[in-house]
């Protein structure tokens, strides 16, 4: 997602943005899970740089994992409820979930935020600090957003505003996804962290 497109969609609600992305990329190529709750590899579009997002993540967390998926309706795994997106579109989806959680969300589940602080932001911090993956599918996904660091910062600024509004600690943004694997470190993200702090 480039800046021009972000400016077009920035005021969408979560469900409006899901509809927009499904019009842009189409619905799931298949159901995300099989009837036995295993991931269906036919749903993947990473060769195009796209990730698969569950539309019902505004209701429940971690729907791409068997353990959490099984605790929720199978309908949420259907192709019609899969939204394709690039990494920055995925980040915006999760920010919008934080801003527009479903009134029917699972009790005691804080939807949206975990995707931002545990997965998407830590990886993009590393990527925009110079980390290069050796996984072909991930490289294809990164290549799709390589020229859109400005959009990343706009999204981070927006998410910081959400955290501040909810009196949550913005330090959760200063992370590295690959540090736990010994492939990168927070220190290597320091310059980016300074830019985030200034937003």
Name what the model sees in each region:
Residues 40-84:
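Histidine-centered nuclease catalytic patch
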Residues 11, 83, 87-90, 142, ...:
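Generic detection of long, well-ordered alpha-helical segments
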Residues 66-73, 99, 108-110, 116:
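"Short basic amphipathic alpha-helical interaction patches in structured regions
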Residues 1-43, 74-76:
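Short, charged surface segments at domain edges that flank catalytic/cofactor-binding sites
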Residues 59, 96-100, 123, 166:
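Generic structural signal for hydrophobic core residues of well-folded globular domains
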Residues 103-133:
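C-terminal/domain-terminus segments
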């Amino acid at each position: 997602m480039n800046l021009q497109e972000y400016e077009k969609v920035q005021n969408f609600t979560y469900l409006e943005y899901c509809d927009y992305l499904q019009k842009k990329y189409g619905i799931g190529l298949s159901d995300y899970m099989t009837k036995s709750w295993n991931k269906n590899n036919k749903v993947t579009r990473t060769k195009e740089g796209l990730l698969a997002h569950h539309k019902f993540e505004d209701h429940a967390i971690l729907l791409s994992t068997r353990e959490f998926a099984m605790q929720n309706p199978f309908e949420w795994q259907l192709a019609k409820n899969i939204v394709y997106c690039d990494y920055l579109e995925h980040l915006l989806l999760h920010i919008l979930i934080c801003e527009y959680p479903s009134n029917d969300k699972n009790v005691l589940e804080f939807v949206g935020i975990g995707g931002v602080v545990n997965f998407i932001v830590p990886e993009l911090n590393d990527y925009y600090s110079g980390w290069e993956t050796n996984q072909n599918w991930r490289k294809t996904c990164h290549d799709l957003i390589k020229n859109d660091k400005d959009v990343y910062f706009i999204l981070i600024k927006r998410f910081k505003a959400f955290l501040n509004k909810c009196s949550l600690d913005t330090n959760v943004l200063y992370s590295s996804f690959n540090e736990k694997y010994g492939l990168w470190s927070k220190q290597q993200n320091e310059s980016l962290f300074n830019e985030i702090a200034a937003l």
